[in-house]
């Protein structure tokens, strides 16, 4: 996934293109929506 950044997060996340939710099984704990993509943390 491409790197992305959310406000208030010190590290980068994974950018998932054209998704409204983060996929399961990757250990993501938080996210922020960047229409039409989503940024999932931690990468």
From Swiss-Prot:
<dbReference type="Pfam" id="PF07936">
    <property type="entry name" value="Defensin_4"/>
</dbReference>
<keyword id="KW-0528">Neurotoxin</keyword>
<dbReference type="InterPro" id="IPR023355">
    <property type="entry name" value="Myo_ane_neurotoxin_sf"/>
</dbReference>
<keyword id="KW-0964">Secreted</keyword>
<dbReference type="GO" id="GO:0015459">
    <property type="term" value="F:potassium channel regulator activity"/>
</dbReference>
<dbReference type="GO" id="GO:0090729">
    <property type="term" value="F:toxin activity"/>
</dbReference>
<dbReference type="GO" id="GO:0042151">
    <property type="term" value="C:nematocyst"/>
</dbReference>
<feature type="disulfide bond">
    <location>
        <begin position="22"/>
        <end position="40"/>
    </location>
</feature>
<dbReference type="InterPro" id="IPR012414">
    <property type="entry name" value="BDS_K_chnl_tox"/>
</dbReference>
<keyword id="KW-0166">Nematocyst</keyword>
<keyword id="KW-0800">Toxin</keyword>
<protein>
    <recommendedName>
        <fullName>DeltaKappa-actitoxin-Avd4b</fullName>
    </recommendedName>
</protein>
<keyword id="KW-0632">Potassium channel impairing toxin</keyword>
<keyword id="KW-1015">Disulfide bond</keyword>
<feature type="disulfide bond">
    <location>
        <begin position="4"/>
        <end position="39"/>
    </location>
</feature>
<keyword id="KW-1220">Voltage-gated potassium channel impairing toxin</keyword>
<dbReference type="GO" id="GO:0005576">
    <property type="term" value="C:extracellular region"/>
</dbReference>
<dbReference type="GO" id="GO:0008200">
    <property type="term" value="F:ion channel inhibitor activity"/>
</dbReference>
<comment type="function">
    <text>Acts as a gating modifier on both Kv and Nav ion channels. Voltage-dependently inhibits voltage-gated potassium channels Kv3 (Kv3.1/KCNC1, Kv3.2/KCNC2 and Kv3.4/KCNC4). Slows inactivation of the voltage-gated sodium channel Nav1.7/SCN9A. Inhibits all Kv3.1, Kv3.2 and Kv3.4 by about 50% when tested at a voltage of +40 mV. May act by binding residues in voltage-sensing domains S3b and S4 of Kv3. Tests have been done on human Nav1.7/SCN9A and rat SCG neurons that mostly carry Nav1.7 channels (EC(50)=300 nM). This toxin also reduces blood pressure.</text>
</comment>
<comment type="similarity">
    <text>Belongs to the sea anemone type 3 (BDS) potassium channel toxin family.</text>
</comment>
<feature type="disulfide bond">
    <location>
        <begin position="6"/>
        <end position="32"/>
    </location>
</feature>
<keyword id="KW-0872">Ion channel impairing toxin</keyword>
């Amino acid at each position: 996934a491409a790197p992305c950044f959310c406000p208030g997060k010190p590290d980068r996340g994974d950018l998932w293109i054209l998704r409204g939710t983060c996929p399961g099984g990757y250990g993501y704990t938080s996210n922020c929506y960047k229409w039409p993509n989503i940024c999932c943390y931690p990468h």
